[in-house]
A protein has these predicted regions:
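Hydrophobic helical h-region of N-terminal Sec-dependent signal peptides
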Residues: 6-12
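Positively charged n-region of N-terminal signal peptides that target proteins for export
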Residues: 1-5
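N-terminal signal peptide c-region/cleavage motif recognized by signal peptidases
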Residues: 13-18
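Low-complexity, acidic/polar, glycine-enriched regions of mature
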Residues: 19-190
């Protein structure tokens, strides 16, 4: 009887350990939120942010967890200096007053143990709004050099920038919808 109880206790402990979440740190050298936005209804402008940080708590068994990504808005990059300077200024991001965009959410709706949605809130320009992203892919491997779990994901969604007080160009016919893509990699913390 004692052996049976010991075996059951070990089995329960093992299943609890395998279901535990792992803490990951966003790899800023491999994480670049990018976006597409309308230009006067005649073309699409694309850009990205070069500086992001954050953390993920991920339970690979359940396919659930939490995510927090902080993006430095001054790192916006359109590939055109004049547009970058304007976007950082008071007429758009106003990075001196609102230096960061922050997304906080939870990984949900797993299929075969992999989440398919990231449901949360985006705070930008002093405004917080709900935002749901589709998780297009998520894969974890053993990092060959660091010998730790390393995960990469691609998520996408869209939002109305006017909802965040970023309405520049609206009077000229610019559409307010922004398509967002986040390519992110994160390393398990020791």
């Amino acid at each position: 009887m004692k052996t049976c109880l010991t075996a059951m206790a070990l089995l329960l402990a093992a299943s609890s350990a395998s279901a535990a979440s792992t803490a990951y740190a966003i790899d800023p050298t491999h994480t670049f939120p990018s976006f597409e936005a309308d230009h006067m209804g005649i073309s699409v402008w694309r850009g990205k942010f070069n500086k992001s940080s954050g953390k993920v708590l991920y339970d690979k068994t359940a396919g659930t967890g939490t995510v927090e990504i902080v993006t430095e808005l001054a790192s916006v990059d359109f590939g055109m200096d004049a547009l970058v300077t304007w976007a950082r200024g008071k007429d758009f991001f106003d990075v001196k007053k609102h230096p960061r965009a922050i997304f906080k959410g939870s990984l949900q709706s797993p299929v075969n143990g992999v989440p398919t949605q990231l449901v949360g809130e985006l705070t930008m320009h002093g405004v917080t709004r709900p935002l749901t992203l589709t998780v297009n892919s998520l894969k974890c491997i053993q990092h060959p050099m660091l010998k730790r779990d390393y995960c990469g994901a691609d998520a996408s969604g869209s939002f109305n920038r006017d909802d965040f007080g970023l309405s520049a160009g609206k009077d000229y016919g610019f559409k307010m919808n922004v398509n967002l893509s986040i390519q992110v990699e994160a390393i398990a913390q020791p």
